[in-house]
Amino acid sequence: MILLELQEQLRAEYNPDGSLLRRQQMKMLDILLRVDKFCKEHDIKYWLSSGTLLGAVRHGGFIPWDDDVDIEMMREDYLRFVRLFEDDDDLVLHTHKNDLHYIMPYAKVRDRHSVIEEHSGGENFKYKGIFIDVFALEYTHKFVNHQMHMKLRRIRKFEHRYKRNRMVDAIISLRKEYAFATIKAWRFISNLLPGKQLRHTLGTWCYRKARYEEDLFPLTTVQFEGYTFPAPHDSDAYLRKIYGDYMQLPAEKEVHTLKIEFLG
């Protein structure tokens, strides 16, 4: 972990208590705690991943300028998670199945009492609250994963090209239904090819690095914002394969959120 003095300087600069970013981070932490409780109740194994794990290891919590939370789980657990998770007055599980304009193969658990505007779009999403991302991992081939990603990307580009109306929505619905229906065929093709690796589920291209079971299992724990969460067995190896020298602070601090509104 970085020196406490440096950590305090970064907090003061990027996410001091009471700032919009810190309020967003605390809301994401609330969602993560709810998801953690749910996963424990249903014996669903997950772990902090990507930048969230990096924040835990390097900062003991959120990277001061970070505005998202990522968790990963194996595809079998992901399918159970999506099947068993129940929406309530505070949270909703956002997937391609309950929103025509959500064209991603992974889920978000969203807060119902906030609205965010992101660089990556989402203006047509049915649900727009603060969220955490839930990613599935499966053994697949990089080429097949990329082909599925390009298919979904073309649908998103089509959506952004035309003004919304019933005909455009109908075309999006048909193309999206066809694209997700072909995942089974792509998965079959992938199983025939050599060189499969543990990667994010077909069509997910925001994280292109492979994962390795020896780095992940058996799971251990890590401290994050004063709470204990599941983590990969070898977080150092996991992070180095993704980020290289992850203890080195980046020159540019990437932020995804443009605007936040807290409701009520």
Question: Could you tell me what each predicted segment is?
Answer:
Residues 6-42, 85-142, 168-244, 249-264:
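Conserved catalytic core of two-metal-ion nucleotidyltransferases
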Residues 36-69, 78:
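Active-site nucleotide-donor binding segment shared across nucleotidyl transfer reactions
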Residues 153-169:
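Short, cationic low-complexity segments
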Residues 143-149:
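A short secondary-structure junction signal
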Residues 1-4:
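Short, solvent-exposed beta-strand-terminating loops
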Residues 139, 151-153:
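Aromatic- and glycine-enriched beta-alpha-beta binding-site module
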Residues 79-83:
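Short, conserved charged micro-motifs
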Residues 72-74:
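Short hydrophobic/aromatic beta-strand micro-patches
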